[in-house]
Amino acid sequence: MNLMIDLTIPDTISAMFGQPCCRKRVGRHRSLSLGFGEKVFHTKPMKDPFYGEWEIGTYSAPWRVIQDNLLVCGSLEDVESIDELDAQIQIIEFGNISSVEMISCFDLRVILENNTYVEFLQVATGEDELVHIFGPNSLYCEYAINAGWKIGRSDVPWTQD
């Protein structure tokens, strides 16, 4: 791993701060998606008929929700189904997003206004992103431990570095 990776959170996501949580969903393989800001409706056959104007989440990294210094839900919960884990996340009141911070070069924390945190945890080596952020105008950001932050567009192919 490159020890010189810049951990600075991209300024391009600062417009997300202060936005209310409008969507939360646990998906396949215990992925997590949190939507913030305005609802952006789509016609895809999905549980939610909309995304958030801003979406932050992970496809494969472990995550946990901490509220008032108590662990209230996590991706490794002993549940019978993804629907059961999704039901747990639906009852949590997330409120507005305050900020995003790197806890270390491995882990990221989403800070919400009501003493709630969502943490994404890197627990294996590899090239998969820890977290991704979709924003307005096809903005796409991702963080991976081997590359740091990358910023681009979600509507065009990315070139290999």
Predicted regions located by residue number:
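Surface-exposed, interaction-prone regions used to assemble/regulate multi-protein complexes
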Residues: M1-D161
